Amino acid sequence: MGLFSRDKPKIKIQTTKKDGFSGWLKCTHCNELIHANELEQNSNCCPKCDYHYRLSTEDRIKSLSNPNTFKPLFQNLQPVDTLNFVDTEPYPKRLANAQEKSTSNEAVVVGTCMINKHKIALGVLDFSFMGGSMGSVVGERLTRLIEHALKEKLPLIIVSTSGGARMQESILSLMQMAKTSGALAKLHEARIPYISVLTNPTTGGVTASFASLGDIIVAEPNALICFAGPRVIEQTIGQRLPPGAQKSEFLLEHGMIDCIVKRPELKQKLAELIDFLKGNFSEENEPSPPPKNLIKKTSPLKDKN
């Protein structure tokens, strides 16, 4: 049996379950009934147990930016099948299927917007597009966004959710790790703030590159953040990790991230962080102390499993 000809595993995508009553859903985490409108008003977080469901790029941008201020950039960059890669199906067919199912034409949307009073450069990865995997176009769009932030002296925010580097682009996808990291080094030298927001899941080459290079690293509650996931580690070394060892609460306790922020509070917290960072990164200003309660630990969200 060939490497790419094996049977496809049945993968279940976690979503809210529809109940028999119109407009009502059952939370897959706590099994409580919630109304769809209530879920939407709470930024797609369960109002009963605070479980954070995934957001589309469109909804993520709406939740973070002031209304009608987002202006997309570099949307003309499109993926190509440089390697003529075929696994269970040709890479161009995978791309076409992903573009048909998603509101995005690639796994990242970049642009500029306003967050409260601040104009910022914003990048949002899309997990619904091939698992948010980083290929050449994802790396190039992010690099150009970083260069745009450098040119215009805009604070940069990247919201990550990804399975890592894109297998179908092989070494070309791995090259994006170095390219994005090099661009961020120039941004840091120019003293322009970069905030990295990690959502569930953020893994692989994305975790090992730009997602971990923020001046401040923010995470959503109970997010899986790692390089290799628990299943891969278990298959490799034959041992299970301790419960929650790769979740954002564990990483906060061990100094890998700076704070955990619930999604409904994220926009305001980012605005406060930009206020603080702009003052400290400006060459004209003396470093100022952080505002009270700017960064604080939150109680861990208990995992259902």
UniProtKB/Swiss-Prot annotation:
Its EC number is 2.1.3.15. Its cofactor is Zn(2+). One of its GO terms (biological process) is fatty acid biosynthetic process. One of its GO terms (molecular function) is zinc ion binding. The keyword Disulfide bond does not apply. InterPro entries: AcCoA_carboxyl_beta (IPR034733), Acetyl_CoA_COase_Trfase_b_su (IPR000438), ClpP/crotonase-like_dom_sf (IPR029045), COA_CT_N (IPR011762), Znf-ACC (IPR041010). It is found in: Cytoplasm. Residues 281-305 are annotated as: Disordered. Binds 1 zinc ion per subunit. It catalyses: N(6)-carboxybiotinyl-L-lysyl-[protein] + acetyl-CoA = N(6)-biotinyl-L-lysyl-[protein] + malonyl-CoA. A zinc finger (C4-type) spans 27-49. The keyword Lipid biosynthesis applies. Keywords: ATP-binding, Cytoplasm, Fatty acid biosynthesis, Fatty acid metabolism, Lipid biosynthesis, Lipid metabolism, Metal-binding, Nucleotide-binding, Transferase, Zinc, Zinc-finger. Its main location: cytoplasm. Residues 23-292 form the CoA carboxyltransferase N-terminal domain. SUPFAM superfamilies: ClpP/crotonase. Disulfide bonds: none annotated. Pathway: Lipid metabolism; malonyl-CoA biosynthesis; malonyl-CoA from acetyl-CoA: step 1/1. Zn(2+) binds at C27, C30, C46, C49. Acetyl-CoA carboxylase is a heterohexamer composed of biotin carboxyl carrier protein (AccB), biotin carboxylase (AccC) and two subunits each of ACCase subunit alpha (AccA) and ACCase subunit beta (AccD). HAMAP family: AcetylCoA_CT_beta (MF_01395). Component of the acetyl coenzyme A carboxylase (ACC) complex. Biotin carboxylase (BC) catalyzes the carboxylation of biotin on its carrier protein (BCCP) and then the CO(2) group is transferred by the transcarboxylase to acetyl-CoA to form malonyl-CoA. Belongs to the AccD/PCCB family. This is Acetyl-coenzyme A carboxylase carboxyl transferase subunit beta. It comes from Protochlamydia amoebophila (strain UWE25). The lineage of its organism: Bacteria, Pseudomonadati, Chlamydiota, Chlamydiia, Parachlamydiales.
